[in-house]
Amino acid sequence: MRVSGFWAERLWGIYFTYLKEQNRNLKYKEVQKTFFKSTDSDLEILPAYNENNIPVVFASDNNYVPILTVALKSVCVNRSDLFNYDIIILQQNITEENKSRIKKELNSENVSIRFIDVGQVFKERNLVTPAHFTIEIYFRLVMQDVMKHYDKVIYLDSDLVVDKDIANLYSTPIGDNLVAAVQDVDSAGCYKEFDPSRKEYFDKNLCLKDPYSYFNSGVLIMICRCLENYIPQIIY
């Protein structure tokens, strides 16, 4: 991938040396070296397919790749020949080796897998990651920026297994709602009786108007074109 870049660097060096030799009065300035950690010029991506596109988004770090791979495999095993599966993985440190392994294992004619580095968006943010969570839990919040050219997308946590065609979920009508999710009955039960600390967290930290409407964010249908107007104020 870098061969053309190496050639360009060396050819430019030769040409610049030639210019200096030919014109002793040439004005130029040499500055210190600069290294870029991320060279992604634009986080916006386009749909992988022109028709029957089913966009599915995951977020993961390199440590979670084995679990992520199981989730990806479950999506691919249950796919239909009638649709194209546009899988996007939001990440910041998955190794090239692991990316290659995943693509080699799962890429097919109607499955596209792409890795998008969104780490730079969160680099200067002092975000809280309690207990066993990592910063990747926030990555879903930039989907409306990364996927501006998508109407509707599915977000899935990496620690689940899909046992049916994910296209069925994508086709679920959600009316005028921006997000579709499932109510978290476990949290509702904890809030009501079993976990006083959960009740305090919901009331004092989250300040939820209706704690019993708390939902599980591990499976979401999101309308990206509309969410763009709401989410940026949360993280920027």
Where are these regions (language model features)?
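Glycosyltransferase catalytic domains, chiefly GT-A lineage
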Residues: 18-21, 38-236
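C-terminal catalytic/acceptor-binding lobe
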Residues: 1-44
